A protein has these predicted regions:
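Ligand-binding pockets and gating/stacking loops
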Residues: 1-448
């Protein structure tokens, strides 16, 4: 198979709302901070609260655009042809569980997966769907394109970054790009993701701020100096209440140490993997992102978000799934789960496969399916999750929930709970307003 770096650079052009990368990256005035600044801010301001955090990391694979549940996870062979589509159910490794024949690879690892077929919410546009599924909370009334500000809820990765224990690597990393609604909101940019901004499937893949630069641009150097001046001002003010804040110079040294650290450099250096292992994942963007994510959690990253795009199949749904989307997805997911298991990491690594909504039961005149948040499917594995089960059910037309509705809040509460973070604890905005991590959801008890 061929390298697919071009896929990620144009990942939004196929979405019906036409979001652009600049809009997504505008998550705060300090959104351009580099690794040293992130390390400084995370260590200076991290205040873990609640019950002790478990040693469980999370790989959060988000299928941007909206996966068609009835063509993948929740096949309806007895529905009319205009609903059931062109795919058929196949038996899987888990007794009694069937999925689509477009996912033969995933059918071999369903014993590790818990498939939730009754996820539901009410937001049918991409921006609002991104937000509710990434944060567990609706963004409020009005149009929303996925570009968070301090009035919105922080995403799961930022919650984990804020409440987890800092390690040698940034606690929240996004690959290959920034995920819609994947920002920290009122928690502040120190808890935002370290974004790779490069496709690990590319032959020349490398990660910024990990390799020592030969030169630093004038603008970037000026920005760092401005941050340092602001830190010095803050240090002087902080002396009246304590000496918990240290010089940013220390964190530049730490970042430089990370650049020269064998462990850190190896974690980001996907080229150290054998050709056989890379081929097992597939030399595609999603395949190599999954492999890189395994390397990152193995090295101590708490939360890795994977952007997997182009699922907005308004046209040619069957062709898009069969020839473009599912082959790479269906290769990457079982490779990741099997690799984690073989390395003894699956019990300590929660893998979440999510999306912003499902697709309409009725196939449209363009042979595609449109947005449908009424019911859809997500899946989880590892991290204490009992595999080989289906939770909830859609109706016979895959149009609504028939049993056990699951909300985005439930999903968010579940991930936090599995990672040992109390989902109902209270955080405060910079103005002192109390905000619960999850105010409308509870952990999905059937998973454990």
């Amino acid at each position: 198979m061929t390298h697919s770096s071009a896929r990620t650079t144009s990942r939004l052009s196929s979405y019906c709302d036409g979001l652009n990368r600049r809009e997504m990256l505008s998550v705060g005035s300090l959104g351009g901070l580099g690794l040293a600044e992130l390390l400084w801010m995370q260590e200076s301001f991290a205040k873990a609260k609640g019950k002790p955090v478990r040693d469980i990391n999370c790989i959060f694979l988000f299928a941007l655009g909206g996966q068609p549940h009835q063509d993948m996870w929740d096949v309806k062979p007895d529905a009319p042809s205009e609903i059931r589509g062109d795919f058929n159910p196949i038996s899987t490794k888990a007794s009694g569980i069937q999925i689509s024949d477009v996912l033969p690879g995933i059918s071999t690892v369903t014993d590790k997966l818990a498939i939730m077929r009754s996820v539901t919410h009410v937001d049918s546009d991409h921006g609002r769907g991104y937000h509710v599924m990434m944060t567990g909370k609706r963004p409020g009334a009005g149009d929303f394109n996925g570009n968070q500000n301090n009035n919105h809820h922080p995403c799961l990765g930022s919650m984990v970054s804020r409440l987890g224990t800092p390690g040698e690597l940034p606690p929240y990393i996004s690959v290959p790009n920034f995920l819609n609604s994947g920002g920290p909101s009122f928690l502040g940019p120190s808890y935002g993701p370290f974004v790779i901004e490069a496709d690990p499937a590319a032959p020349d893949f490398s990660v910024r701020d990990i390799t020592l630069p030969t030169a630093i641009s004038t603008n970037r150097n000026a920005r760092r100096q401005a941050v340092l001046r602001e830190i010095n001002r803050f240090e002087r003010q902080a002396e009246t209440v304590g000496r918990s804040v240290r010089s940013l110079d220390t964190f530049y040294q730490k970042a430089a140490g990370l650049m020269t650290s064998k462990k850190a450099k190896e974690a980001f250096d996907i080229h150290r993997e054998s050709d056989k292992t890379r081929a097992e994942y597939g030399m595609t963007s999603v395949g190599q992102c999954c492999l890189l994510s395994r390397r990152l959690v193995e090295a101590g990253c708490r939360f890795v978000a994977i952007e997997n795009g182009h699922w907005d199949t308004h046209r040619k749904n069957t062709y898009s799934l069969k020839d473009l989307l599912c082959p790479s997805f269906d290769r990457a997911v079982p490779a990741l789960l099997n690799d984690l298991e073989q390395r003894g990491m699956l019990d300590d690594t929660l893998v979440v496969i999510s999306t912003e909504f499902g697709r309409t039961p009725q196939i449209n005149q363009l042979a595609g399916r449109d947005h449908w948040p009424n019911v859809f499917s997500i899946a989880m594995a590892g991290g204490g999750v009992k595999g080989g089960q289906v939770i909830g059910a859609s109706d016979r037309r895959a149009a609504g929930v028939a049993d056990r509705p699951i909300t985005p809040g439930d999903m968010t509460a579940t991930v936090l709970d599995l990672m040992g973070i109390d989902p109902h604890q209270i955080l405060h905005t910079p103005l002192g307003r109390p905000i619960p991590l999850v105010d409308d959801g509870r952990p999905i008890t059937e998973l454990t």
